[in-house]
Amino acid sequence: MSSDAPDSFEPGAGIAAEVKNARIEDEMEQSYIDYAMSVIAGRALPDVRDGLKPVHRRILYAMHQAGVTSNSSHRKSSSIVGETMGDYHPHGDSAIYDTLARMAQDFSMRYPLVDGQGNFGSVDGDPPAAMRYTEARMSPIAEELLDDIDKDTVDFQSNYDDRKQEPTVLPSSFPNLLVNGSSGIAVGMSTNIPPHNLGEVVDATVELIENPDATVADLMEHIKGPDFPTGANIVGRNAVHKAYKTGRGRVRVRADYDVFEEEGRIVINELPYQENKARLIERIADDVNEGKIEGIRDIRDESDRDGIRVVIELKRGAMAEVVKNQLLDNHLESTFGVINLALVDGQPQVLTLKETLEHYLDHRRDVVRRRSEYELAEAEDRAHILDGRLKALDNIDDVVETIRNSESRDDAKAALRGEVEVEVDGEPLPTFDFSEEQANHIVSMQLGSLTSMEAAEIEAEYEDVQATIERLETILGDQSELDAVIESELLDIKDEYADDRRTSFVANTGEVTRADLIPEEDVVVVVSEDDYIKRMPVSRFRAQHRGGKGIIGTDLKEGDNVSSVFVTNTHDDLLCFTNHGQVYQLKAYQVPEMSRTARGKSAVNLLDFDDGEEITAVVNCDDLEDIEGYLTMVTRNGYIKRTGTDRFQNILSTGIIATKLDEGDELVDVEVTDGESDLVIGTERGMSIRFDEDEVRAMGRSARGVRGIKLEGDDVVAGVAAIDEAHHSWILTVTENGYGKRTDLDAYRTQSRNGKGLIDIKANERNGPVCAINTVGEGDHLVVMSDEGQILRTPVEDISTVGRNTMGVIVMDLDEGDAVASVDVIPAAMTTEAEELDDADSVEEDAETDAKADADDE
């Protein structure tokens, strides 16, 4: 060890002038936020104004500065990459070259911004040739993005080493964000904007200029939908309208193909956007070899520089339509997930179609205003010079005499400015009051400019400049005139570059699917502890007064008990959360419909469960894409977290993680919340706590969450309820021994999370532990199911309203040894207003009739 080493470490010694102590959690959080915002604003998301990310903008500006324009010769890509990296973008050369190459690909960009020469990749996924072999220059339409950039139209900032200035945004003569689209993944967010037809986008922008109150539907009269560079077909228009109206949507894109029934051949002419042709052919061949697709004997790729042509030869006797449908199910259709996310004033925002165009127009108005101010200043300067020249020509003899008799050039200028007096033979010459700029110009005039013809030209130019000044002042003083300039320039761009649509629309008729054959109806779904699952129509369970035994709802094998029951619609999407913290997705109609006396089907045939995994909570909705807000989850040991619903849009068949769990903990309940709800957590021992949802910050799927309630002893969480005061009036609690109560929401005061809470219901020997806690409103019905498979349906109004810390009333009459297993609410919208309550005897009689009907059905 060196003898120079210090004996002890002193804070700050040899490190910094000041050492600041900080909690590592705070430092990590702030550093991560800084990193995230750097990625969001500096790399991954496009600016709404010019539709470019920084790397695209820097490449184009570097080419502009180097003179690599559309009318210049091509330059080596390595040279362009080097200049971009050296002057503006200090990152890896491969990232810059990949971006440059993509801007040159006509199958990636609807209107390529780079004119490439050489191998820049292919639709088969072939990579571009090395940058030393390829050459590039700006395309003509790319120059429109930089037009007037030298007229103070946009702000500039210092480059990374303060040597040069770079634009923060390009002037952008057309709405490039919509025209060429964009995609990127940032921290916690992503963007995926499809390309569009330039002519349609210009027409929509002009419509918005002329009619600022235009709706999305009005704009869609011009913009029919995405226009992909690879063509293909968009299936239906509803998804497109939703994407334009909300900024998010899923658009189905189908390959364009021809079916030749007599020849036994299917020919694919166009592929969905971003589909890899080589991989598509490989996947089809694999499915044919594995027997998943029948009737195909050969696949040939006959594509050339004129377009795509994939020929699928059918076996003798194979039905072309059947094979086509198999291909559509697996290969010839893809989904383009629209996320119209862009930077607005440096902040990421999801934008509607109208908002996107409005932000572009705001930018363009600013550009045209600044350009007009710049040109006005130049015109006024020129008019000032011309005015001086005209005055000089009117007094040419005196001006020449003054200059000739001045001792120096500076004296001549001073004399023209009227600052000194010039004498000839003792007599003073006339004085002038030219400005410094005029004097400088007059002194520099050549004798040839003193001709009468030159004077006429100066006067004509002066009149033209005055007209220009008047025009520019009109533009700057009248918003409608400024908008007229924008409109005219947009239409010029359209005339120069617009082309026909490549992507067509096909009706969303398609083939008859299983879903088309299943009627929409409200159903009760029952899940057992051994993961047997089935569904039954809600109509099979007639409402009765509380205190009844209900009717048989399912058959159970020995040792099995009911785990959960919930009410949904056959066409709903189901998110099935398990005790292991996983979530799975399926359609409600995928759950087999069976009689009340049937056992059900093993859920492992529907969901890929691990050993010991069982469903503990289900969230259902009309369409998974329509869920907005958060999924709020609670665990058995009192942890709670909420995660944005957008994190659950693409759930694998094997499930995905919904929440991280500590060893020995389990996920017990999940609620959909809107970000402004109050939450009530209930425990098995009858405690409850109400707090604002904002106290639980949004987290990712793999986070554990925070403490929601402080549990005492061996108490555990029974469930969570979200309060929507517009629809909910009471908290309804049910215990395992069949007792329950309704309590007004006001009885549960709001506290801070992680408290012990208040007594909700007495969980004594008579009542037993709490089984479920729900929020209910007028007209709602309750579905209560016991361990042994009995189901009771009763209106919530039939259950007494009492305070907290009370015993409650009998809800379900249980047989000895039986217990309440699960409770769910039938919303008032699902109940029939004219429905009459049955007493227990009539329910038993109906049960016998239903059982006979079920037996006949089976």
Curated annotation (Swiss-Prot):
Feature: compositional bias, Acidic residues: 833-848
Record's function text: A type II topoisomerase that negatively supercoils closed circular double-stranded (ds) DNA in an ATP-dependent manner to modulate DNA topology and maintain chromosomes in an underwound state. Negative supercoiling favors strand separation, and DNA replication, transcription, recombination and repair, all of which involve strand separation. Also able to catalyze the interconversion of other topological isomers of dsDNA rings, including catenanes and knotted rings. Type II topoisomerases break and join 2 DNA strands simultaneously in an ATP-dependent manner.
Positions occupied by motif GyrA-box: 544-550
GO biological process: DNA topological change; DNA-templated DNA replication
Subunit-level organization: Heterotetramer, composed of two GyrA and two GyrB chains. In the heterotetramer, GyrA contains the active site tyrosine that forms a transient covalent intermediate with DNA, while GyrB binds cofactors and catalyzes ATP hydrolysis.
Cited SMART domains: TOP4c
Note from the entry: Mutations in DNA gyrase result in novobiocin resistance in halophilic archaebacteria. Few gyrases are as efficient as E.coli at forming negative supercoils. Not all organisms have 2 type II topoisomerases; in organisms with a single type II topoisomerase this enzyme also has to decatenate newly replicated chromosomes.
Keywords, ordered alphabetically: ATP-binding, Cytoplasm, DNA-binding, Isomerase, Nucleotide-binding, Topoisomerase
Species assigned in the record: Haloferax lucentense (strain DSM 14919 / JCM 9276 / NCIMB 13854 / Aa 2.2)
Active site, renumbered: 133
Alphabetical list of HAMAP family matching this protein: GyrA (MF_01897)
Region spans: Disordered: 833-858
Listed Basic and acidic residues bias regions: 849-858
UniProt GO molecular function: ATP binding; DNA binding; DNA topoisomerase type II (double strand cut, ATP-hydrolyzing) activity
NCBIfam families, A to Z: gyrA, PRK05560.1, PRK05561.1
Gene: gyrA
SUPFAM superfamilies assigned: GyrA/ParC C-terminal domain-like, Type II DNA topoisomerase
Residues in Topo IIA-type catalytic domain copies: 45-517
GO CC field: chromosome; cytoplasm; DNA topoisomerase type II (double strand cut, ATP-hydrolyzing) complex
Enzyme Commission numbers on file: 5.6.2.2
Record protein name field: DNA gyrase subunit A
Compartmental location: Cytoplasm
